[in-house]
């Protein structure tokens, strides 16, 4: 692949994990940057770094631009515009785009999905990592695949017509169920794009379980305990 410029997009909480693993395994990459904030620098990679192996890590929520309003002391509201990182990363043209927890872009109408789609179109190669490609309904997989391979499964409506069952909700028709007669066809088409493995199939090939101790603040521990009590 010869990917000199690699971009990882992940949940914010996973950015430090990627940094730790990059330091441990990514010896081929001489430098890395972790993106923060909603307003990027005009050039976040210096000119003397162009052409060297570079790794960039971002979270989904800072890619899309947004408008934020805050109340002023004297009354009224002040509005700020934030551009987001998407355009800067499109201009950077990654050799490889990695989407961690890729089901985050299953919703085509979300701003983050549109931002990731722009970056994906500018990337030479794309890799999506997720254990739950279908979160709630089958259309989730169409949203994800359309970011990675635009048009490969037709429009959202065409996909629903082909692989889902219409259900009348009392007001109109919506596509929720699965067309079992064409499920095997869909699975066959997806194998061209996806690599899926069950734990039972690869358990013997996996290393021994590793336990990692993660330090937390008192408030995090208290919140976790209260959450468990609520579940009970």
Feature names for model-found ranges:
Residues 100-101:
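Walker B catalytic acidic pair
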Residues 14-39, 148-150:
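Conserved helix-turn-beta segment of the N-terminal RecA-like "Helicase ATP-binding" lobe
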Residues 141-154:
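A short helix-turn-beta junction within AAA+ P-loop NTPase domains corresponding to the substrate/partner-engaging
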Residues 39-55, 61-93:
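Conserved helix/coil segment N-terminal to the catalytic DExD/H
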Residues 124-137:
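Conserved helicase ATPase motor motifs in RecA-like P-loop NTPase domains
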Residues 57-63, 81-91, 110-124, 153-232:
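Inter-lobe coupling linker of SF2 helicases/translocases
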Residues 1-3, 115-117, 147-148:
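Walker A/P-loop NTP-binding motif
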Residues 3-24, 135-140:
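Conserved Walker A/P-loop ATP-binding site and its immediately adjacent core
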